[in-house]
């Protein structure tokens, strides 16, 4: 049977068309591939392993009308208290049937005191968590242990708090830690949620996909929740995972070797989670990649607006406005097995900023992994290099920045040629705009054993003047326009050499530190002026 064809529709409201696609792919979970139904909307990707989904089959037949082996689609036979896969000493959703739970406690908050045992602890297993848009649920109660001895807890109970610490906004890991640290006497606030029973019966590969993308400055453990639990929109589809595409990194050939070119990867904004999907062939994989990448890219305008609202008038730093941002693959230095890594790159009016994940909180925007002034940065390579290009090198570009420590180089890879063009154009224009905005830079130097100042002006060129002494005005020793500069060089340590073709010959300036920033700034000024004059084709 052929793979379901992609359905493309334009969104309501007259905006640009975004791909909406549906079909069968495979997802990698715990080093095994599992068939899943994938639905792409304008802003999310939904993976599901549900009964009946095999009707859309395009990658092999399903088993017993379903796929995602291990999804727990079987149901207990009436009158049988225990399913075959439930250990005799464990209470599960197969043994604690919803109809056996008193109606009087359904959706009612209860306080239950549990005395931890030295062996076995509380004697429960939990599922759910904020990353799955679900409360923390008791999925198993071990018979004879502490929780079971209370005779007041049920499989399907949502744990609202532990010793007063609110778990309604907790991730799974946070809930585990809260229960571990709770001490010997534990007061649980719980509420039985009958609709959660299908979820806690048995997990599926899709339900094991971790994916947490909390909003900026979201409350963490103990922060409380403004909404009552019953009004929160939790999804109890145990075999469905919704992945918001906003600020996801959609790429290929990064995490896992893909010799057949059938895979695509979706990395979470916090860089903690990766979903790897595989198609039946290269062409189908490329079609899925293009659709998902396009939809994620269309959300960037909304992302920039959200960041501006979050940061307010201050901008990222010094009122610097975001001009462009997005994910790129960055080459890992050295001979590491991992050749590329995700990098969030942001261009402001004056800087190139690199983050290893999407900042969630306002203060995180002020702490990038790298921050480079565009004025001292240049684009030095774009597209395939000399000789046989390596995989991905045809969409790569490099930047070099002059710093006090020398030259720092970064090699990036875009996903499509349009992205490559946009990034390279944005960086070059950013360098030129920064040159015009800055207009002039001044640095201390020593010239012929005299303390001086070197000034480089965007329009007027170079000047060397003496340091003012005892209130006297500085004296200009040398002044020269860019047109007279015949050659410039440096020793990479502290000396800058300028030759204006005058009788004094080559001018030697001791900058007292690495000259690379000044060398790169001179290049930026010259490049911007040439471009402004229309001398670049």
From Swiss-Prot:
Alphabetized GO MF terms: actin binding; calmodulin binding; PDZ domain binding; structural molecule activity
PTM: Phosphorylated by CaM-kinase II.
The keyword Signal appears for this protein: no
PDZ domain ranges (all copies): 111-194
SMART domains to which the protein is assigned, alphabetical: PDZ, PH
Gene3D superfamilies: 2.30.42.10, Pleckstrin-homology domain (PH domain)/Phosphotyrosine-binding domain (PTB)
Phosphoserine PTM positions: 86, 125, 204, 218, 225, 231, 235, 388
Notes concerning its domains: The PH 1 domain mediates the oligomerization in a calcium dependent manner.
Name of this protein: Beta-1-syntrophin
Species name: Mus musculus
């Amino acid at each position: 049977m052929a793979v379901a064809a992609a359905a493309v529709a334009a969104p309501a409201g007259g905006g640009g068309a975004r791909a909406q696609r549906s079909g069968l792919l495979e997802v990698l979970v715990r080093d095994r591939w599992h068939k899943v139904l994938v639905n792409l909307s304008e802003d999310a990707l939904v993976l599901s392993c549900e009964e009946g989904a095999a009707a859309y089959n395009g990658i092999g037949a399903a088993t017993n009308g379903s796929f995602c082996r291990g999804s727990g689609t079987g149901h207990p036979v009436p009158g049988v208290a225990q399913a075959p896969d439930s250990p005799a000493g464990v209470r599960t959703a197969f043994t604690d049937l919803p109809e056996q739970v008193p109606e009087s406690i359904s959706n009612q908050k209860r306080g239950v005191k549990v005395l931890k045992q030295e062996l076995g602890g509380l004697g429960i297993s939990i599922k759910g968590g904020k990353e799955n848009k679900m409360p923390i649920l008791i999925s198993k109660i071990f018979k004879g242990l502490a929780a079971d001895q209370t005779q007041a807890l049920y499989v399907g109970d949502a744990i609202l708090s532990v010793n007063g610490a609110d778990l309604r906004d907790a991730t799974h890991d946070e809930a585990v830690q809260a229960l571990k640290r709770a001490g010997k006497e534990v007061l649980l606030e719980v509420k039985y949620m009958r609709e959660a029973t299908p979820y806690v019966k048995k997990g599926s590969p899709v339900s094991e996909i971790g994916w947490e993308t909390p909003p900026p400055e979201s409350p963490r453990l103990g922060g409380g929740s403004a909404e009552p639990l019953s009004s929160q929109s939790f999804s109890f589809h145990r075999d469905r995972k919704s992945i918001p595409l906003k600020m996801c990194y959609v790429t290929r050939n990064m995490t896992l070797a893909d010799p057949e070119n059938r895979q695509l990867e979706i990395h979470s904004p916090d860089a903690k989670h990766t979903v790897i999907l595989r198609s039946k062939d290269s062409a189908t994989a490329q079609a899925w990649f293009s659709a998902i990448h396009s939809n994620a890219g269309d959300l960037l305008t909304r992302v920039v607006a959200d960041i501006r609202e979050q940061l307010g008038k201050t901008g990222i730093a010094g009122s610097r406005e975001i001009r462009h941002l997005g994910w790129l693959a960055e080459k890992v230095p050295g001979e590491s097995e991992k050749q590329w890594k995700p990098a969030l790159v942001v261009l402001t009016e004056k800087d190139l900023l690199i983050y290893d994940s999407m900042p969630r909180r306002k203060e995180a925007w002020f702490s990038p992994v790298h921050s480079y002034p565009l004025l001292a940065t240049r684009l030095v390579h774009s597209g395939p290099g000399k000789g046989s290009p390596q995989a991905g090198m045809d969409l790569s570009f490099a930047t070099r920045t002059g710093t006090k420590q020398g030259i720092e180089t970064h090699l990036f890879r875009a996903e499509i040629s349009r992205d490559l063009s946009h990034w390279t154009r944005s960086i070059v224009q950013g360098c030129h705009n920064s040159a015009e905005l800055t207009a002039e830079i001044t640095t201390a130097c020593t010239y012929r054993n005299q303390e001086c100042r070197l000034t480089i002006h965007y329009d007027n060129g170079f000047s060397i003047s003496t340091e003012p002494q005892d209130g006297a005005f500085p004296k200009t020793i040398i002044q020269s326009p860019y047109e007279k500069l015949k050659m410039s060089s440096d020793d990479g340590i502290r000396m800058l050499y300028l030759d204006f073709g005058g009788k004094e010959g080559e001018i030697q300036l001791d900058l007292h530190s690495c000259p690379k920033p000044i060398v790169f700034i001179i290049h930026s000024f010259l490049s911007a002026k040439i471009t402004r004059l229309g001398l670049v084709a």
